[in-house]
């Protein structure tokens, strides 16, 4: 396990009780380098969406743990936020919650001469994802998915 994965795993282990105590769920943890800066990002979610107060409460509580445990060698910036309107689908529960939603898919290899699709998620299993595009059903191999996330739909 590399440094990045190790820090993400340790953060996940340590923050789980904090998010539960604050009435939210852990969506994801990322430890990434952008430019010359390292970022430890914790994404939280709850039914109806998270508030700034939710993020602030988790951040304050976990900062104390980060200071005490001191398991990250690099200097880093710690952030807590929502996964956003165009959240990625990473875990099985993300797929389950997304049935009937508009999603965007980017593929590693083109299917029917395209690498990008948008449609309503109809079903999924461990190997495939099926979406409906203008009443046409299309199934993709999950191994070919470079990215799958909620599509931003402006309902004005």
UniProtKB/Swiss-Prot annotation:
Its main location: cytoplasm. The keyword Cytoplasm applies. Keywords: Cytoplasm, Ribosome biogenesis. GO terms for biological process: ribosomal small subunit assembly; translation. The keyword Flavoprotein does not apply. Belongs to the RimP family. This is Ribosome maturation factor RimP. It comes from Lachnospira eligens (strain ATCC 27750 / DSM 3376 / VPI C15-48 / C15-B4) (Eubacterium eligens).
